[in-house]
């Protein structure tokens, strides 16, 4: 299995090879990583044997200059599996992937306060532990809010006269993510409904697989023209169901409400203008994304005149699954240009 993963990662964009289908399985993806200890109260990575929780981490190459790939909802780090197959190899582009608490191969406690803030805490704990000195932030879906939280914290620390903390940031790449509180367009029967489920009902979400694959909200992840297969749906289900984790669909579905509650603090216009002269930004979206399709239009309307780079790709919300090669090409091109600062 390790040889298979090495071959796939090594092919990359330059290799021009189509990876074998088994490289895109949840089992292969998680076999290529590790579970490390995490103490949320102290916001620190700790020895695994003493850890209250264990989180999934996958590294490709030297972490000192790694690109930080932050996961989307609901597929977690596994969502990057196809994209990785088309990215430059680990030497040309070191990479760091992770699952937040509750996602993928990380532990999934039922009595945990899931939020944007605790996700940012985890990212900030991982960076120094791995010796990350410089990074490009690549965020998909709700990790856009984690990026906004991380950048806002640095501004707040600076205002208090404290060190910004964390690695130097080379650039910020956000795709199909929420940026503006008035731009969320999630259909009512998806996250808005899920977040209102009582705790007792959350454990039955997504079960059995036969019900999961017929759930309207799940089908909405892909464009109407994309013929998602049972095999793809089963791999998604497998990644989400690890460690009895399907309840996370409802437990973490409050991220939009979280965003709206902190709308002023996580205002993308202010954050972008504060950093635009320090490193480049790219905001992208899919043509048929039903969840965040207004975000790109609002970004262009509000920040296009200030130099924000905006890109679109065809397809539905799960660009990582539906258009992995095109998304990988955008990411690789952006990372190559991160040494060029906006004028």
Model-derived regions, located:
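Glycine-centered tight beta-turn/hairpin loop motif at sheet-sheet or coil-to-beta transitions
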Residues: 48-54
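Short hydrophobic "strand-cap" motifs at the C-terminus of beta-strands
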Residues: 70, 284, 315-316
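Solvent-exposed amphipathic alpha-helical surface segments
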Residues: 90, 130, 157, 334-342
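Flexible "cap/lid" subdomain of the alpha/beta-hydrolase fold that forms the substrate-access gate
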Residues: 2-44, 55-59, 78-79, 96, ...
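Conserved HGGG/HGGXW glycine-rich cap/lid loop of the alpha/beta-hydrolase fold
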Residues: 56-105
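Conserved acidic functional residues
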Residues: 72, 141, 321
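Catalytic active-site module of serine/aspartate enzymes centered on a nucleophile-bearing elbow/loop
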Residues: 304-343
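Short, well-ordered alpha-helices that flank and scaffold nucleotide-derived cofactor binding pockets
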Residues: 82-89, 152-156, 298, 329, ...
